[in-house]
Amino acid sequence: YVLINDKEVNGYTLDKFEPLKLLDPITEDRNTLRYSMIPSLYKVYEYNKAREQKEISIFEIGKGFYKKGEVYGEDTKLCVLMSGKYSTGLNNNKTVDFYVIKGIAEEVLDYLGYAGRYSFMKQEMPKEMHPGQSAMINVNGSNIGMIGKIHPSVTRDDVYVLEINLDELFTKKVGKMKYKEFSKFPSINKDIALVVDKKAISKDIEKVIKSAGGSLLTNIEVFDVYTGVGVGIDKKSIAYSLTFSDMKKTLTDEEINELMDKIIDAISKKCGAELRK
């Protein structure tokens, strides 16, 4: 539904809007046009949870409405909400976390032509979002959305959301699509688990890994983040899947091992990371 309670109109946003209330609402719970789509999807989540659904992944492309002074407007938005486990086709037991919702945002932005032109910024977040597990999505210097975990004051469940203002996004000039030839030689995957400071930012570590791996490192993906027994109170473990390939030949084990040693040395010196044993 595009209708929410008027008390929710300024939820999940740092902006302040006047409620766009209906003159004759059917119910007071749905008496106002929404601005953020997250309250709508959260109601769908609660409906399904009440019916014993534990693995919930939903999305919507729809409208958000606002009134600021004498200005009325509406924006087209994409909203995703996920909780529990989900199927990737490869691993049916993957638990949704910050990096899963971040990966979805990256795939959407890359597909739309914004690869390399966005970043995830740790800034002031709406009070409904967990400050330690949320970020603004910034494209060309402007915030066009956010990702993260819903604050424990709202729900004790691990619920993650993504919201992108598509109208705002599409005002940013899209880079030209370029064809990239795929290697006809097999790629090689290597996993690496690192123990780093709890406040370490994965994107910074990925930059060091990419720099050390060079052109033969074709993909980096976070597949696990762990805190708890075995990694230290002020530490966390981040596991990465690294893909290597060469356009001209099949890489040897010796070449891969040399690259891995170079990567490990770089992240140890620049990020203070240790291999998880």
Predicted feature locations:
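Conserved alpha/beta core surface patches that mediate binding of polyanionic ligands
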Residues: 2-7, 35-83, 161-175, 214-231
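Long hydrophobic segments that form regular secondary structure
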Residues: 49-52, 58, 64-71, 80-89, ...
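A general structural signal for short secondary-structure junctions and capping/turn motifs
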Residues: 30, 48-52, 68-72, 127-128, ...
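Residues forming anionic-ligand binding surfaces in small-molecule and nucleic-acid pockets
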Residues: 18-23, 63-92, 184-191, 235-245
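A carboxyl-terminal module marker
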Residues: 9-11, 91-277
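Extended, well-folded interaction surfaces typified by the phenylalanyl-tRNA synthetase beta subunit core
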Residues: 1-56, 190, 243-247, 251, ...
